[in-house]
């Protein structure tokens, strides 16, 4: 049986929110089979649980925000991406503020946290959502066009293309493909950091956003170059971060996908719109398990390696 996974023990982290600049503590705890991933706002007078789902996403401006019972958690995508990359099905996430800490701006710190706690196989089959027919969402035309698509695929593959007219981005790859069967999430994707431009940061801070952002947790560019003294972690770090974000956004479905995801200039809003479009067509997907893990698509049966 290809089994569900949780943590062997709890693990903690402290950081600041990218947009709020607020100090926040995270405690990641094991959860029973079929729990799913549950954020718990423990700072509130009455703690509120927010179970991840496509419908729980209530805001997609600059990040993915989930809500329930009047409580919110912002910027969940990097932690969700790490859970997707390591195949974590069940997890309690206690959080002391309304934004997940940005840490180093990638998913690598979350991968380290999860792996340091240890990953435990559980006595219940892992449930996948297998895409049976193509589903697509589009916006704009010509130079403003953007789209995202899910297609049938016996595995999990993502391809993404960006289109930034900037010297630092032009000199790197603007398209990348990652297949879970042949690549390593921890090595190939997890270390890609979020990025932004100085002109946008100034505007966001004037609006009370990006208050926790800086050169230690983002790639920052002026009109011509990358300002971080250490440079890039990957030659194509910009577009790889978009893959990282997409994996996190898609994992908000609540189950891992068996599908090929492809996108052009997509973002948090379009990724969530794609999930809702999939769920709106019940003939476009099915829920499957694998009694014999040898029959499962390559890449899901082995625990992800550290880099």
Curated annotation (Swiss-Prot):
Species in which this protein is naturally found: Polaromonas sp. (strain JS666 / ATCC BAA-500)
Entry keyword Hydrolase: yes
Name of the protein: UDP-3-O-acyl-N-acetylglucosamine deacetylase
Catalytic activity: a UDP-3-O-[(3R)-3-hydroxyacyl]-N-acetyl-alpha-D-glucosamine + H2O = a UDP-3-O-[(3R)-3-hydroxyacyl]-alpha-D-glucosamine + acetate
Taxonomic lineage from the root: Bacteria, Pseudomonadati, Pseudomonadota, Betaproteobacteria, Burkholderiales
NCBIfam families: lpxC (TIGR00325)
Originating gene: lpxC
GO cellular component, one term: membrane
Pathway participation: Glycolipid biosynthesis; lipid IV(A) biosynthesis; lipid IV(A) from (3R)-3-hydroxytetradecanoyl-[acyl-carrier-protein] and UDP-N-acetyl-alpha-D-glucosamine: step 2/6
Chain's role: Catalyzes the hydrolysis of UDP-3-O-myristoyl-N-acetylglucosamine to form UDP-3-O-myristoylglucosamine and acetate, the committed step in lipid A biosynthesis.
Disulphide bridges: none
Family label: Belongs to the LpxC family.
UniProt-listed Enzyme Commission number(s): 3.5.1.108
Gene Ontology BP terms: lipid A biosynthetic process
InterPro entries per UniProt: Ribosomal_Su5_D2-typ_SF, UDP-acyl_GlcNac_deAcase, UDP-acyl_GlcNac_deAcase_C, UDP-acyl_N-AcGlcN_deAcase_N
Keywords: Hydrolase, Lipid A biosynthesis, Lipid biosynthesis, Lipid metabolism, Metal-binding, Zinc
Keyword match Metal-binding: yes
Residues binding Zn(2+): 78, 241, 245
An annotated Gene Ontology molecular function: UDP-3-O-acyl-N-acetylglucosamine deacetylase activity
Named cofactor requirement(s): Zn(2+)
Residues at the catalytic site: 268 (proton donor)
